[in-house]
Structure formats: structure tokens, C-alpha cells
Swiss-Prot record:
Main location class: cytoplasm
Source organism (scientific name): Salmonella typhimurium (strain LT2 / SGSC1412 / ATCC 700720)
Keyword Cytoplasm: yes
Upper classification of the organism: Bacteria, Pseudomonadati, Pseudomonadota, Gammaproteobacteria, Enterobacterales
The name this protein goes by in its record: Heat shock protein HspQ
Function (record text): Involved in the degradation of certain denaturated proteins, including DnaA, during heat shock stress.
GO annotation (BP), single: response to heat
Positions of the UniProt region annotated as Disordered: 76-105
Family membership noted in the UniProt record: Belongs to the HspQ family.
Single Gene Ontology MF annotation: DNA binding
UniProt entry keywords in alphabetical sequence: Cytoplasm, Stress response
Length: 105
């Protein structure tokens, strides 16, 4: 069993770039199409660790879906981000849905 460091709905930061994001899904290992060595120069150990679907904002405030390795992320300690309220709202909405999902008939 592979344990993930971050959970769905959790706010995280990109380790190198510092961008704020929200985890929307988790893969236990790299699961996109097999990359060519030019596209993704990672070792097997990194590919075997959890990978995260993370929504971040671009410079214009538009949502961007990213796919990042666990090693590329760090925890975000603050819950409120006045400079990016949409990321706070997305995180709250996801956590609320996980706690009280709406059932469809």
C-alpha cells in the first residue's frame, strides 16, 4: 500500500515555483501515458511515488490543471489567501463535498 503525503482538498505549494494549489485527485504512481525520456526525466522511484492532480492559477488568475510528483509539493500552512481567494474557495468546496456528499437519485 502506498501512502500519500497530501489529501484531496488540501492546499499545497509547488516546491520550486511557490505557486499555491489545491489537490483534486491522487494517483498512487505516475499514471499518464508513458513519457519519453525527453518529456519526463524522472527515475523509477519517483514514478512509483504518488502523483497529484493539482489546480493552480496562472498569472491571469485562470485555473490550470497540473500533474505533479509528491516531491514537487510542500504543505501550505495558511488556510486563508487574500491574494488568491478562488483557491481557498475551491479547497473549502472540495472538503465540504468529501464530508457530506450529495447523493444523486
Amino acid at each position: 500500500m502506498i501512502a500519500s503525503k497530501f489529501g484531496i482538498g488540501q492546499q499545497v505549494r509547488h516546491s520550486l515555483l511557490g505557486y499555491l494549489g489545491v489537490v483534486v485527485d491522487i494517483d498512487p504512481e505516475y499514471s499518464l501515458d508513458e513519457p519519453s525520456p525527453d518529456e519526463l526525466a524522472v527515475n523509477d522511484e519517483l514514478r512509483a511515488a504518488p502523483w497529484y492532480h493539482v489546480v493552480m492559477e496562472d498569472d491571469d488568475g485562470q485555473p490550470v490543471h497540473t500533474y505533479l510528483a509528491e516531491a514537487q509539493l510542500r504543505s501550505e500552512m495558511r488556510d486563508e489567501h487574500p491574494e488568491q481567494p478562488s483557491m481557498d474557495e475551491l479547497a473549502r468546496t472540495i472538503r465540504k463535498q468529501l464530508q457530506a456528499p450529495r447523493l444523486r437519485n
